[in-house]
Amino acid sequence: VQTCALPISDLQISMTIAKKPDFARVLEIVGEIPFTVLTLAGCGMIIRFRNRNSMVKKQGALIGGGILFSLFAAMGGFMTWNYLSRNLGEISKIWILILGVIMAAVAIWITMQIPEKNRKKALRFAAVALVYFVLVLILMNCLKTVWGRMRFREMTDPFNEFTRWYQICGRGGFDDRYASFPSGHSMNSAGVILMILLPDFIPALKDKRKVLRVCTYVWCVVVGISRVFMGAHFASDVTVGILLSFALFDLTSTILYKRKGEKESAELD
């Protein structure tokens, strides 16, 4: 209902609040970090809890998990550096390494909070995190390319250049100026919902699922609103982005947890 109503006020909202305040700049820089760190932690779990009964599987998990861990750390460092440069001016590229190492360290710390007895649950989380991240990345970029909705901050004549969220304006390829729909930051910020799975296998978070869920929703709303303040997206872009990300999480976790549960039941039989 909200999404259908937003086209009426989409442009007016952006024209009123898209002033790029400092808090919105900060959230542009850090908004996607939690999702990256949680996915990094999933890679760390693959490495730590790899199969030790088969040399092939053991080495495969070590190499594959190590490559993924390095790629996600590098990507997280680069993306954060890019947003820092965009908001603070060009900064040294050494920060790509520094930021990537910091994210990797936090991910490793999360991984080390898991007792050995929860190995299977941790690997299940890793599978969900990786598949979910990839699906978000693919769907986000495909929709941005196909929709071609112009960002508010790129408009010189908003009243004539504005299009509603449901209008497809393909531009013949991806162009960041026309990548307003859906909001990538919103889809990635919603990835923090992976936190609600952590209490299953991290003892320190036992009985904290409701708190983590509330934190997830608050984070999504705050980051989403900041994107409108930055003029990067319209309110409808943010709303659809969050909903799509949550839908992908529900789909991924439901399928993988159900499949894993059926496999474990068969093993018990």
Task: Tell me the role of every PLM-derived stretch.
Residues Q2-L6:
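Short, small-residue-biased leader/transition segments that mark boundaries at the very start
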Residues I33-R48, I98-I110, A190-L194, I242-K258:
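Hydrophobic cores of alpha-helical transmembrane segments in multi-pass inner/ER membrane proteins
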Residues L11-M15, F49-N51, A73-N87, P115, ...:
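Juxtamembrane "helix-exit" motif on the non-cytosolic side of transmembrane helices
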Residues K57-L62, T111-T145, R213:
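Interfacial segments of alpha-helical transmembrane regions
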